[in-house]
Amino acid sequence: EKGFPYYPTDTKWRNDIFNQLVNFKRDTLIDRKNKVIGQSAHGLNLAWSYMPHAWGIKCGKMKTPMEIWEDEEHLSKGLNKILSGTFFMKKPAHMITESDMRSMLRRYSGTQMVSNFRPTAAAAMYDIFVDKESPLEGTTAGTVWDPSMGYGGRLLGAIAAGVNYIGTDPCIPTYEGLEKIRDEYGHKHLN
């Protein structure tokens, strides 16, 4: 009825998610003693909102979420799993959200979706390993080079951490999404 449950693309939603990412306390993810950077999903949905084509990208021989969506039998089985509470939290039909649908399409048996780097983890790594702009310390923002940018997680992490980011990606629809992220949230280079 509504069409595929892509992530929202409206400016207010995106700006709210971006602000949550920027304001997230990344230092809570860093466990220096055990040399571990923890996980938080902040900003991941923002990255995905620029990559609608990702739902149809094949991972080996697995079905894509888009293939499940387009197959009435599989889609019906997935919906029944939500309605009955099998594998998913049980919900009546009128309570099923687009988020529930995305989750089901990702986790449906025999299905795999491409993955993304968590922006908070990327930003935490940049916080540790890359210089920041600081007139007080006399430093300028360092630069990260990403030879295979993926779906925007590391780019958003670089923006949140305030470091320069240079990247390449061979997939045209992916690169177009990355350019939109850069144009809408990236810092303008001053030189």
Identify the role of each PLM range:
Residues 1-43, 52, 59-191:
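Class I S-adenosyl-L-methionine-dependent methyltransferase catalytic core
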